[in-house]
A protein has these predicted regions:
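Non-catalytic, surface beta->alpha helical segment in thiol-disulfide oxidoreductase systems
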Residues: 55-82
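Local sequence-structure signature of Cys/Sec-based thiol-disulfide redox active-site neighborhoods
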Residues: 1-19
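Structural micro-motif
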Residues: 46-54
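Thiol-based oxidoreductase modules, predominantly thioredoxin-like and allied folds used
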Residues: 30-41
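Residue-level recognition of oxygen-bearing side chains
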Residues: 15, 41, 70
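Short, ordered loop/turn segments at secondary-structure junctions
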Residues: 8, 38, 58
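Conserved helix-turn-beta segment immediately C-terminal to the redox Cys motif
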Residues: 17-32
């Protein structure tokens, strides 16, 4: 599973990255987390407000910081959809 945190490196973006790390650990689903700071790539996802969270190419949150349990649910839902 591929998870991307979209944003220019602001405090909220860093916090979302930390929440995503905790959510991956909590969910037990193998995943890689990548920070995307390039404005062109962020724009390619249609994100108007950062931070953004992308799971397997799908934008699941934008302009807010979902907490660890919510992200863990997003991860397990995406993993179940792959099966």
């Amino acid at each position: 599973m591929e998870i991307k945190v979209l944003g220019p490196g602001c405090a909220n973006c860093k916090r979302l990255y930390q929440e995503a790390e905790r959510a991956v650990a909590q969910s037990g689903v193998p995943a890689t987390i990548t920070k995307v700071e390039a404005i062109e790539e962020i724009a390619s996802y249609g994100i108007l407000r950062t931070p953004g969270l992308v799971i397997d190419g799908k934008v699941v949150a934008s302009g807010r910081i979902p907490l660890t349990p919510e992200i863990a649910t997003m991860i397990t839902t995406a993993a179940a959809a792959k099966v």
